[in-house]
Amino acid sequence: MDEPKHITILNTFTVENIPDLDVAVLGALELFSKEPVPTIDLKTVYKKPLIVGSGNAEATGRIIFQDVDAIFASESNFEEKLKHIYAIDGVVVVSASGGKHAPIIVKTAKKYGKHVTLITNSTYSSASKELDHAHSYDEYVFPKNREPYTYNTSTYMGMILGSTGEDPGIIYNFIKEHIATISFPDFLQYNKFYLIIPSKFSGIIRMLHVKFIELFGRQIARDIETFEYVKHATTVVPSDELFISFGDTNDSWGKPENRLHIPLPPDAGYAAMMAIGYFTIAQIQKQHPPYFKERIVAYTKEVSGIFEHDILPIVE
């Protein structure tokens, strides 16, 4: 692996020179190549946990606990699950910041008599203050990099690595050797993209959708489906869009000139899929107008009022 130059960029940028998403990806892989991540093991703690998160935290929870007999929920419906599913014997809250909805979820879970585990990147968070802190499994705190608000790349990637055990150095080298060297098309020709991913990574779909929403809003249209689901009437109405396939080659969808293939490592896990997916989206970000960079400062001021506490455009 190269010297950790991307971490240096992340440690020094300002709102005047916000880096693209690929810097956060490579910086995260640099971080986890030198700092170990906790191993999440709650199989002996809970028999039927409720896994709760907001946005990409919810998606991360689904990935981490995909092989567990668990119930999944967001901030919008978790209390309904607690009310009606009596088999739930504990609540796992996934939250990078441990703020916003997280402390509300913890308080509500305890109101229903459920033990709570917090998976986070922030020590001494508002949610952490609500925990029992009587067991080693009450809180898992993962390392993270300094990043633009909402990028949440090192945060959730670390949690996924703590579950999959993938080697971040191998992922980093694969990106540098096999992805960064691709002659990417002129993405500015397209404002519609269709990402096709291997079926075994269906859990990443929500994370990629959210990243498109955060970076481009409704300025760029996107669909993201698996190789199996794309067969189900998703292209009835044709469009001048770029089809980007990950792993397998797309020989069926879109005009041949509107297809881009992105390779994956042969033994890729969810962390590799996340890193390569985000890195690819960053190439689109580089070529389109800087929608995110121009709006993030104003947005954090607006949303601070909604959550009634300061949310900054740079997460230290």
Tell what function each PLM region has.
Residues 33-88, 187-232:
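Anionic-ligand anchoring segments at beta-strand to alpha-helix junctions in alpha/beta enzyme folds, i.e.
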Residues 175-183, 229-239, 296-315:
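Short, mixed-charge aromatic SLiMs
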Residues 10-16, 21, 152-190, 292:
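YjeF_N-associated NAD(P)HX repair module
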Residues 263-316:
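Charge-biased C-terminal accessory regions appended to nucleic-acid-, cytoskeletal NTPase
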Residues 1-36, 150-153:
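Cofactor-/ligand-binding subdomain signature composed of acidic, glycine-rich
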Residues 202-284:
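Internal helical hairpin/lid segments
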Residues 44-173, 246-263:
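Glycine-rich phosphate-binding loops that contact phosphosugars or nucleotide phosphates
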Residues 170-171, 219-223, 288-297:
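Flexible, glycine/charged-enriched surface loops at secondary-structure junctions
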